[in-house]
Amino acid sequence: MRILFVIDGLPGGGAEKVVLTLAAQFLRDGDRVSLISLRDVCEYPLPEGLDYQVVADRCRKPWRKLTELSRRARQLDAAVVRAEQQGQFDLVLSNLHKTDRIVARSRALRERNVWFCLHGVFSASYLGHRTGFDRWMKQQKIKRIYQGRNVVTVSDAVGRDLVEEFALRPAQLKTIYNPFDITALRAEAEADSERPDGDYLIHVGRFHPGKRHDRLLEAYAQSGIDAPLVLLGQGKPEQEQRLRQLAKTLHIDDRVWFKGFQKNPLPWIKGARMLVLSSDSEGFGNVVVEDRKSV
């Protein structure tokens, strides 16, 4: 079987890791696997045998945002046509909402077996801060993408949220929980690392408003806990700077350690006294499974 993953880059998030875990298993099963990344960013090692290509957008025109989706769909179409000279794709898995918006406009994939993979709770991510007409418009935009299409979600709650909050009906709606290679996970937890000695708390996740690092820092400041708080992750520089400034304002900057993205966070997780999770919502809390299975 020939399988294509499409994703908006591999910058080090949970969904990206899931995609590569699935790709590796398909390859072990003897399938031919391709991955098209829509950004030239990759923080993870790629599985051996993966056909990986980047279809990055080089447009720098002032009006590029107005034409982004249709332009990028054409770029994706060209890449798919080239790739299918070696055989048609039997299964196409689109991951992350921005990717889905582009794949939904693809002409080359219109007659393919396309599944849209949802990794998060959309109402929390896209409706939580919206009201009135703005909220209704966002609901309609999301509905247009997924209505009548094949959708797979990482938990039942993600699927229910999509149907109930956006009043849409997929052609097929399936739940497939995120995969974990438990044997490899436990081996990785034993690897050498630069984790600190002694007790510490840990949070693993990209710097994004939905992860609510602000709430985490405020709660940590109020807790009176002396053990340091280790933050593993990265994001936009301005977001990290805001968090660093908040730590200073709360007078905890000497106890909050920003350690960046770690390709293997498992030794850090295993060595922590406590794992903390502060997100507004999680489609599937990968790090919780990793924490429980790494000990």
Locations of the language-model features?
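Membrane-proximal helix-turn-helix segments that form the acceptor-binding/catalytic region
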Residues: 132-151
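N-terminal strand-loop element at the rim of the active site
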Residues: 5-12, 17-19, 25-67, 158, ...
